Amino acid sequence: MNPIFALPQADWNSLMPEIVLTGVASLILLLEAFAPRLRPVFNGMALAGVAAAAAILAQQPAGLYFHGLIESTALTGAFSQTILLATAIGLLSAQGYLKRERLLFGEYPALLLWCATGLLLLVRGVELVTIFVALELLSVALYGLAAFHRREAVSSEAAIKYFLMGALVSSCVLYGAALVYGETGSTSLAGIAAALAAGTGSPGLL
């Protein structure tokens, strides 16, 4: 059996907030493509997804999941709920602007939900590769949001500049993670801390 599917149910439950947000975002994009007449309800769908993710997070027990890739604590729970609250505020506060600019498309709530997904993984990730993947998910969604106003040249310009800066920063983060792994032999934050505390490698280089 594939080891991914052999994971305990608790591991999958720990990712349920991200799964819910990703599922709702994907559904909104499908409806945008095949049933655009439903655009008025997309924002409500996104808010329902955020509320569901918040409810799941509130009931999530503390612990390490996915072989130590993700951690749930009271602190990560508080940050995650703050992220979801900010996402809900972003969905509600943008409605007037989107209507005024005639930009009520499904991509906006979908991209915002993917931003929230990346942020949740970033908050709860305790391993360098997980953190990097979360950062990239967040960045790709933000590139789309930066270019969302298709009729404005400044929006496209901002997206291009952000993409170039994001590519540079991603390269630096990945290179730094490779150096840390080379010095400590671990991508886990706990393993890195233990290696540095033991005095192995060259902490000054890091």
Positions of the model-derived regions?
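Alpha-helical transmembrane segments of multi-pass membrane proteins predominantly involved
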Residues: 1-206
